[in-house]
Amino acid sequence: LAKGKDIKRVQKMVIDLQRTTDALTRKDIKNWRDAWQYAINVDSPSRQRLYDIYRDTEIDLHLSGCVEQRRGFVMARSFKIVDMKGDENEEAVHFFDQSWFKQLMRYALDSIYWGHSLIELGDLYTDGDGCICYSDVKLIPRKHVIPEYGRVITDLGQDWTTGIDYRQPPFSDWLIEAGRPDDLGLYLKAASQTIPKKNMLAFWDTFGEIFGMPMRIARTTSRDQKEIDRLDKMLREAG
């Protein structure tokens, strides 16, 4: 494992990332295709736009329900660690039957949908049972990771060649990759369906606001044509 000064370097790399707010703007199929094109650019790949679309994709009710159901089934399963003879090593299981490992599994499962994910292990400590554990497991912000070249950039839009090579020590001792470097995740396919679905719901909402209101009827006892014309104009302007 990394020495004390190396641990500080790893932690500093994460702290120095200049986080930005995700753009919650309306997306369409053209945005999806353009984002895909940016992500597969050979010279300067960038998944930033694609992740903005994925953020919209994951809130789809049906899709999120399917994802959570699958995650629940996997996380509910028990596991065991065996040696070469097939005998279970209960002591080894105790090291992994901890909250940090469950969080690691969640991030690994998410990588199936989001694509490549870079996971950071926290500091080592000893729990009440004398078991060595990691204090936390965190996900390196995906927009800052260029998995095709194994780099982490501190600022969005930064040239990947100036980023930190996380596949070399000491960073490789504390960072775990989930998914292939070129994996864009299943949300790439799902987005082509959730984007039109969300937009059509917005269109129907607008349609309902305009045409879903009951018909307005105005009655008057006046026979004055000016009064009738004024009432007619008022109804027309009301929509």
Walk through the language-model features, giving the residues of each.
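Active-site acidic/histidine clusters and adjacent loop/turn architecture
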Residues: 60, 68-72, 76-79
